[in-house]
Structures are given as structure tokens and as C-alpha cells.
């Protein structure tokens, strides 16, 4: 999932993320209609509330094609269609707050006025240098494919109740670990997009 020199918004954020602390330690297809893989119950209701906390690492290429790495902690709060994502340094300092609603999106950086746009992806790309797929993550973290577009899923042969991989909207989402009982949910997930290249690693705290 460097900020201080006065170069550009994305450069400043990158420097803060990249120098905030030690690197994050982050130690296998059948086509199906999107709704066919959704868990039963209320998880897809638009009124659902979800909260996730954990660590992120992002690899991407900047505008000059140079590879970049950013990492830190994250706090995700979701209420219906509204999402708030806070990115923090490993020491807990707020680096950026992204808010997305069906009507608009905003992004706040420390000591700067909030920025607004109708497209949260474009706002993050222009400001941070990379864009997290918030619309897809709302479902992929459950985990289930997003309902609006076709998806391919692979079930874990060792546990058919667990999804091992989702391919959707140009992304490959690999579920590396689930929480140990009695806890439930995803524990580690990697997301990869080939074009443009973007690699996201998430570890969710229980």
C-alpha cells in the first residue's frame, strides 16, 4: 500500500513512505459469474460496515519508469459505499488519508489542504504516484469477486471454503493465508497488475 523535498506531491509522499522505518517483512482457474462466488449472507449489502488494520507494501514504476517501493501501516474503515483509508508510517504517523464516496473523493496530506476529485483512482495516482484499487478491494478483502464485472476464481484444494485466487479487472489477487480459528477472514493477500505494473502486499492484523 518520499515526501519532504519540495519536488512534486508524489515525490514528497514517496520520500516519507520510503524513509519512515525498516522495510515491511512479508515472509495456486475456472471462469465464473461474479455473483456465483459471493459468500451467502449479508456481506454484499451496501449497508455493510468493515474495518481492516494492517501493513502494506507497494511496488510500482514512477512517471520516468523507475521502480519505487513504499510501505507502512494502514487503517481501512468502510460504511456502506463510503471508504476511508489512512496510510501511516511504521511509527504511526499519518501520511495520507483517502476518502471515497459515490459522489466524490478527497485526499489529505500532512500540513496541506485536502484535494478533491470525482475519481479516487486518478486522485491517488496524481498525488501519491500510485493508485490502490479501492472499489475492488471492498470485495476482495472479504474475500469475494466484485459483483459488477466477470471474474475467475480458484478454490484452495486443501480447503474448499477458502478462495485461493481471484482474477478480475486486470488484477490477480492471491490469498496466501487466512486467519487461524477461531478468527476468520484473510490474513495475507498479494495483488498484482501487469499494465501498468503495480504490486501490492497486505498483511491484515487480527
Walk through the language-model features, giving the residues of each.
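Post-signal-peptide N-terminal segment of Sec-exported extracytoplasmic proteins
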Residues: 45-84
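An acidic-aromatic
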Residues: 82-131
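Bacterial N-terminal signal peptides that target proteins for export
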Residues: 3-18
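Amphipathic hydrophobic-ligand
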Residues: 68-72, 95-99, 196-200
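Gly/Pro-enriched, hydrophobic low-complexity segments
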Residues: 146-206
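C-terminal motif of bacterial Sec signal peptides marking the signal peptidase cleavage site
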Residues: 24-28
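Bacterial signal peptide processing site
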Residues: 30-33
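Flexible, processing/modification-adjacent segments and terminal tails
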Residues: 111-169
Amino acid at each position: 500500500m518520499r515526501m519532504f523535498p519540495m519536488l512534486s506531491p508524489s515525490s514528497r509522499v514517496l520520500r516519507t513512505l520510503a524513509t519512515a522505518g525498516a522495510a515491511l517483512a512479508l515472509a495456486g482457474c475456472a471462469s465464473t459469474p461474479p455473483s456465483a462466488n459471493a459468500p451467502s449472507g449479508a456481506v454484499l449489502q451496501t449497508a455493510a460496515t468493515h474495518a481492516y488494520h494492517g501493513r502494506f507494501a507497494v511496488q510500482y514504476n514512477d512517471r520516468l519508469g523507475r521502480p519505487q517501493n513504499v510501505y507502512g501501516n494502514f487503517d481501512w474503515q468502510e460504511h456502506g459505499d463510503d471508504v476511508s483509508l489512512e496510510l501511516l508510517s511504521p511509527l504511526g504517523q499519518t501520511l495520507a488519508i483517502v476518502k471515497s464516496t459515490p459522489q466524490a473523493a478527497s485526499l489529505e496530506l500532512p500540513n496541506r489542504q485536502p484535494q478533491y476529485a470525482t475519481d479516487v483512482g486518478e486522485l491517488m495516482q496524481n498525488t501519491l504516484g500510485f493508485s490502490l484499487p479501492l472499489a475492488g478491494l471492498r470485495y476482495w478483502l472479504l474475500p469475494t469477486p466484485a459483483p459488477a464485472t466477470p471474474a475467475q476464481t480458484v478454490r484452495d484444494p486443501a480447503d474448499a471454503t477458502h478462495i485461493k485466487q481471484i482474477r478480475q479487472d486486470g488484477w490477480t489477487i492471491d490469498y496466501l493465508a487466512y486467519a487461524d480459528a477461531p478468527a476468520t477472514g484473510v490474513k495475507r493477500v498479494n495483488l498484482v497488475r501487469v499494465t501498468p505494473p503495480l504490486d501490492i502486499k497486505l498483511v491484515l492484523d487480527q
